[in-house]
C-alpha cells in the first residue's frame, strides 16, 4: 500500500467509522490504520453499531504490540482480552480461528485448512461476515457463522482441488450448498 493510500485509509477509518450508525467489519488495511491510531494513543475507531475486527496473527501483533510467540501461547485469552478492550467481536484468524465477544463468549472454529492462508481468502470471509451483519445477525453470531461456513466451504474445496491447489474463488461455489444444508 502506498503512503498516500495508507493516509487515505487511515482518514476514512478515523473519521468515517465513528459516525457510521450500523455494524461494521474492519479488515486488512482498515486494521493497519487502526494499529497506527492505537500506536499514537488514539482510541480504537468504533461505529455506533457493532464492530467486528478480523486480524490474522501479524495484524493482531501490530494492533496489540504483542509478539507472534506471545499470541500463539493463548489465542483464546488474547482474543477475549482485546474483544473487551475494543468493545468489538474479534475474529483472530489462523489454524482454528478464534471468535471472541466483549460479553465473554468465545468459540474456536473446527473447520478450515491451510489453503485459507492464500491471499484473498480473508476477503471472502470479510464479505460473508458483512453480508450476515446486513441480514441482521448480531455480530458474534454472524462472525461465528461466517467463520464456520468459510472453513467448511474451504474444506470442501480442498477435497476437490487440494489444500494448496484451491484458490479463494473455489470457496464460493461450496457456500450455496452449505447454506442450503444449514438452513432452518
Where are these regions (language model features)?
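Feature representing long, continuous alpha-helical segments
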Residues: 77-80, 107, 126-127, 140, ...
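Charged C-terminal helix
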Residues: 152-184
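Glycine-rich phosphate/dinucleotide-binding loop and adjoining beta-alpha-beta core of small-molecule
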Residues: 1-111
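A short structural micro-motif
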Residues: 70, 149-152
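Short glycine- and Lys/Arg-enriched binding-loop motifs that mark or flank ligand-binding interfaces
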Residues: 26, 90, 108-111, 115-119, ...
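Short beta-alpha connecting loops at secondary-structure transitions
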Residues: 63-64, 110-116, 126, 130, ...
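Short, charged, surface-exposed loops that flank catalytic or proteolytic processing sites
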Residues: 66-75, 136-144, 162-166
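Short, small-residue alpha-helix embedded
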Residues: 61-62, 118-149
Amino acid at each position: 500500500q502506498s503512503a498516500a493510500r495508507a493516509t487515505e485509509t487511515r482518514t476514512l477509518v478515523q473519521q468515517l467509522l465513528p459516525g457510521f450508525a450500523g455494524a461494521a467489519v474492519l479488515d486488512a488495511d482498515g486494521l493497519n490504520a487502526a494499529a497506527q491510531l492505537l500506536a499514537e494513543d488514539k482510541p480504537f475507531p468504533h461505529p455506533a453499531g457493532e464492530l467486528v475486527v478480523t486480524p490474522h496473527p501479524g495484524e493482531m501483533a501490530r494492533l496489540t504490540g504483542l509478539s507472534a510467540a506471545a499470541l500463539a501461547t493463548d489465542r483464546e485469552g488474547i482474543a477475549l482480552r482485546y474483544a473487551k478492550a475494543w468493545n468489538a467481536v474479534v475474529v483472530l484468524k489462523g489454524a482454528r480461528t478464534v471468535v471472541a465477544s466483549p460479553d465473554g463468549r468465545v468459540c474456536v472454529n473446527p473447520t478450515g485448512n491451510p489453503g485459507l492462508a492464500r491471499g484473498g481468502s480473508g476477503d471472502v470471509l470479510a464479505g460473508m461476515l458483512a453480508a450476515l451483519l446486513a441480514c441482521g445477525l448480531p455480530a458474534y453470531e454472524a462472525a461465528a457463522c461466517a467463520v464456520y461456513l468459510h472453513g467448511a466451504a474451504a474444506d470442501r474445496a480442498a477435497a476437490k482441488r487440494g489444500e494448496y491447489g484451491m484458490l479463494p474463488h473455489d470457496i464460493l461455489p461450496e457456500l450455496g450448498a452449505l447454506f442450503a444444508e444449514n438452513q432452518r
